[in-house]
Amino acid sequence: MRRIVITGATGTIGMAMIGLCIRKGVEALILCRKDSARAGRIPVHPLIRFRYCDLSQMKDWQPEEQESYDIFYHFAWAGTTGTARNDMYLQNKNVEYTLDAIRLAGRLGCHTFIGAGSQAEYGRVEGKLNENTPVRPENGYGI
């Protein structure tokens, strides 16, 4: 059985991943910040393990003994709305948090790390995005 880790699980992509895990019989460790207003949306299910871990805590977070996973999905990001989108100190901190997540993935035994971006990296685009779409971010969140 595959075992995965998900950050940003209370967002749209994260919630869809949790549902997919349950349907496919994949065990998932959900890392969620303590003050998340949407933590209650995470389903209680035998395949879903829930642990509190803020982005700023990933650097020092230690897995339990014998805790090992295959794939780490990193969907968490701070400052995705309002004026925080242009707070470059916070957006740069997100880069550091992502590096911390990569290191945590290693401590958890993950052989694969998948990090998701957003449309903000492309700016305003007519039509569908694809791997050849030029990036023209319009705010710090997109950079």
Model-identified regions with their sequence ranges:
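N-terminal Rossmann NAD(P)H-binding glycine-rich loop of SDR-like oxidoreductase domains
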Residues: 4-24
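SDR active-site strand-loop-helix element
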Residues: 7, 31, 72-78, 113-119
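N-terminal Rossmann-fold cofactor-binding loop
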Residues: 31-36, 55
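NAD(P)H-binding glycine-rich loop region in Rossmannoid oxidoreductase-like domains
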Residues: 55-93, 104
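Short beta-strand element of Class I
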Residues: 27-29
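Short-chain dehydrogenase/reductase
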Residues: 91, 138-143
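Rossmann-fold cofactor-recognition segment
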Residues: 44-58
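Conserved Rossmann-fold NAD(P)-dependent oxidoreductase catalytic core, especially the SDR/UDP-sugar
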Residues: 99-139
